[in-house]
């Protein structure tokens, strides 16, 4: 499959590219805002580069694409306007294009708390509301999907064992971006993850094993 990675230049996006290169099972198309970002991602292992912007025209990014991983985000520290533009409306635009281009699978990187943003700390509500709106839009779109909601992210290396549940009993732990990327990739092909929404955090199981028992 040719996998379009939206948010390819972010920490998780870079993890996705390097892991997919190591797996050598899929082609990767990295979507970037600037050509120079693409040069760096080519060195990291991206097979193709497409320059496009969530806030502008991106229809050409979906040419000859089989599946999409949406790992873009404005970050929880940006203001509401930017968050809505990227995390909500940008995601919706990508979902619409996925549908019109008959994309086989759309994997969304969401966040723990997106199911109930109203109970989150006030400074996080705009971010989680945008994530919730994007998730719900994807679920109603008719595009085959997986929505992955990690706990707080860390940059720890080689920490790839996880716990995956529809609703985690303990949401206070962190999870490495490396483990998140591994989960997003596994979700592309595992039937247990198709049309599912689940939360992940650090744990004791390999990703593929954990995804078999999310319920």
Feature map (PLM): residue ranges:
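N-terminal Rossmann NAD(P)H-binding glycine-rich loop of SDR-like oxidoreductase domains
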Residues: 3-24
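Conserved Rossmann-fold NAD(P)-dependent oxidoreductase catalytic core, especially the SDR/UDP-sugar
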Residues: 6, 11, 29-31, 82, ...
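NAD(P)H-binding glycine-rich loop region in Rossmannoid oxidoreductase-like domains
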Residues: 30-100, 188-189
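Conserved catalytic-site region of short-chain dehydrogenase/reductase
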Residues: 77, 112-119, 153-157
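Substrate-positioning beta->alpha
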Residues: 91, 171-186, 196
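Flexible, glycine-rich beta-alpha linker
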Residues: 146-165
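Glycine/proline-rich active-site loop of Rossmann-fold NAD(P)-dependent oxidoreductases
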Residues: 156-162, 187-196
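Core catalytic loop region at the nicotinamide-binding pocket of NAD(P)H-dependent oxidoreductases
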Residues: 190-210
């Amino acid at each position: 499959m040719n996998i379009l990675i939206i948010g390819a230049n972010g920490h998780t996006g870079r993890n996705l590219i390097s892991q997919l290169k190591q797996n050598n099972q899929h082609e990767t198309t990295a979507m970037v805002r600037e050509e120079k970002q693409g040069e760096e991602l080519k060195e990291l292992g991206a097979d193709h580069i497409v320059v496009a912007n969530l806030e502008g025209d991106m229809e050409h990014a979906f040419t000859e694409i089989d599946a999409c991983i949406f790992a873009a985000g404005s970050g929880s520290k940006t203001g509401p306007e930017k968050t809505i533009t990227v995390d909500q409306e940008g995601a919706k635009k990508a979902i619409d294009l996925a549908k019109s281009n008959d994309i086989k699978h759309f994997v969304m990187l969401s966040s723990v708390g997106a199911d109930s943003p109203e109970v989150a700390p006030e400074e996080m509500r705009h971010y989680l509301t945008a994530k919730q709106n994007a998730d719900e839009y994807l679920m109603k779109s008719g595009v085959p999907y997986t929505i992955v909601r990690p706990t707080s992210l860390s940059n720890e290396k080689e920490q790839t064992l996880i716990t995956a549940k529809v609703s985690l009993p303990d949401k206070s732990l962190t999870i490495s971006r490396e483990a998140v990327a591994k989960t997003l990739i596994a979700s592309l092909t595992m039937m247990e993850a198709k049309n599912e929404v689940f939360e992940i955090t650090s744990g004791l199981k390999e990703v593929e094993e954990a995804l078999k028992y999310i319920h």
